[in-house]
């Protein structure tokens, strides 16, 4: 491959680092901020030269579609370990959350994002009751299976009406308050509930 200028090397290393740590490439603006270039056209020019020299491949129809043509990085990403996290389609009272009949699919979650947890499941969020916690309608919450919770934890709970809900948990004097993170909604007050797990992460597709 053709030798790179110092600036091109900086840009390439930044892209590699972002892909390695986040799993996707940076935007043109992020590249410019990282290497001290205020002009997006200048960044585009460097990216074009990196592409012509065989270091990257770009898709002009997509803003972040930068592929690193680097065998070492490719091999490292290919060998990255993943765990198969069950994606729960429904929650049935009296059954384990990961009962076979509840599982719709499996999601390949990189181990480095699982934070050492093994007993995980994912559940699609429906509605806007947790928007102020950054959990939106259509998101998938990543949940660690556990049967207890501390006040303030965001949990998946089964209510007395056998409905699963994602709310913030508070055990109070003679009841449990399942608090939405939406100022327009009222809390759910129950005498008891079953904790299915604690939310530890969120997965979202960006359209």
Curated annotation (Swiss-Prot):
Record-annotated DNA-binding residue ranges: 28-48
InterPro entries: ArsR-like_HTH (IPR011991), LexA (IPR006200), LexA-like (IPR039418), LexA/Signal_pep-like_sf (IPR036286), LexA_DNA-bd_dom (IPR006199), LexA_repressor (IPR050077), Peptidase_S24_LexA (IPR006197), Peptidase_S24_S26A/B/C (IPR015927)
Top EC group: hydrolase
Molecular function per GO: DNA binding; serine-type endopeptidase activity
One of the GO BP terms on file: SOS response
Gene3D superfamilies from the UniProt entry: Umud Fragment, subunit A, Winged helix-like DNA-binding domain superfamily/Winged helix DNA-binding domain
CDD domains registered for this protein in UniProt: HTH_ARSR (cd00090), S24_LexA-like (cd06529)
Active site residues per record: 129, 167
Catalyses which reaction(s): Hydrolysis of Ala-|-Gly bond in repressor LexA
Keyword Glycoprotein assigned: no
Cleavable signal peptide: none
Assigned EC number: 3.4.21.88
Organism superkingdom: Bacteria
Keywords (A to Z) from UniProt: Autocatalytic cleavage, DNA damage, DNA repair, DNA replication, DNA-binding, Hydrolase, Repressor, SOS response, Transcription, Transcription regulation
Pfam families hit by this protein: LexA_DNA_bind, Peptidase_S24
UniProt site (Cleavage): 93-94
Keyword Repressor: yes
Subunit and partners: Homodimer.
Task performed by this protein: Represses a number of genes involved in the response to DNA damage (SOS response), including recA and lexA. In the presence of single-stranded DNA, RecA interacts with LexA causing an autocatalytic cleavage which disrupts the DNA-binding part of LexA, leading to derepression of the SOS regulon and eventually DNA repair.
Similarity section: Belongs to the peptidase S24 family.
Protein name: LexA repressor
Highest classification ranks of the organism: Bacteria, Bacillati, Bacillota, Bacilli, Bacillales
């Amino acid at each position: 491959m053709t030798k790179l200028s110092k600036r091109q090397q900086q840009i390439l290393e930044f892209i590699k680092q972002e892909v390695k740590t986040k799993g996707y490439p940076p935007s043109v603006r992020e590249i410019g901020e990282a290497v001290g270039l205020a002009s997006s056209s200048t960044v585009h020019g460097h990216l074009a030269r990196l592409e012509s020299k065989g270091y990257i491949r770009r898709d002009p129809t997509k803003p972040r579609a930068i592929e690193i043509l680097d065998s070492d990085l490719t091999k490292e990403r290919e060998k990255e370990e993943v765990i198969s996290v069950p994606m729960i389609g429904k929650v049935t009272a009296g059954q384990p959350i990961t009962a076979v009949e509840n599982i719709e699919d499996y999601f390949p979650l990189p181990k480095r994002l699982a934070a050492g947890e093994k007993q995980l499941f994912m559940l699609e969020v429906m509605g806007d009751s947790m928007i102020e916690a950054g959990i939106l309608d259509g998101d998938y919450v990543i949940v660690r299976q556990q049967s207890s919770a501390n006040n303030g934890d965001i949990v998946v709970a089964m209510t007395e009406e056998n409905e699963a809900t994602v709310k913030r948990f508070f055990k109070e004097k003679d009841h449990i308050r399942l608090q939405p993170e939406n100022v327009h909604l009222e809390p759910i007050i129950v005498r008891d509930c079953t904790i299915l797990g604690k939310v530890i992460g969120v997965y979202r597709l960006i359209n």
